[in-house]
From Swiss-Prot:
Protein name: A-type ATP synthase subunit D
Protein role: Component of the A-type ATP synthase that produces ATP from ADP in the presence of a proton gradient across the membrane.
Location in the cell: Cell membrane
Organism: Methanothermobacter thermautotrophicus (strain ATCC 29096 / DSM 1053 / JCM 10044 / NBRC 100330 / Delta H)
Gene Ontology CC: plasma membrane
Gene from which the chain derives: atpD
GO molecular function, one term: ATP binding
Subunit structure: Has multiple subunits with at least A(3), B(3), C, D, E, F, H, I and proteolipid K(x).
Family under the similarity heading: Belongs to the V-ATPase D subunit family.
Record PANTHER family: V-TYPE ATP SYNTHASE SUBUNIT D (PTHR11671)
Amino acid sequence: MAQEMIEGINPTRMELLKLKQREKLAVKGYSLLKEKRNALIMEFFNILERVKGSREKVEEHLKEAFSDLTEAQVLMGDTAVERAAMSVRESVEVDIDSRSIMGVVVPVVDARATQRTVVERGYGLVDTSVKLDEAARKFEESLALIIELGEIEKTIRLLAGEIESTKRRVNALEHIIIPRLKNTVKYIEMRLEEMERENFVRLKMIKKSMEME
């Protein structure tokens, strides 16, 4: 593959200058893409470390929430808990924004609105238990953590895709484009040198022929 050249190139000085400029730009682009790839990989693993912690938090909060819910059912009865649950506002609003990581647009989700006061939840205070309030709070916290985890996992997928794309471009420059440019430049330089030698010999022969006349 390293011996391949760019096809359809005329061995002229103008073409040589153009190819050298292309080679220079390709080498610079290769260097910049390598820096981008390395920075993306570093960011990828930094974010990946957060995933395990986020999942553990979600599991812990859900476990506590279900424990409180079970206690509330024992204290209030299943029917009262279901009635309270039916009166809670179902829809939850979140703010979704975005940010850029090395040119990769990733989501930023603000899930603070998932956590509400007892009044905002909508169920009555007279016939409910404190344990139900605690269960509701922990479920809301769990929801916020789940949304945060989704944001992290989406970011990881987007970064992984960009890393793979950047790797392919780096490999193409390193193993195909730059070697072909270098080989073509070398070929043109050799051809120009040959043409100069041929012209020199031709001129020498013409001069000798003229001197013999």
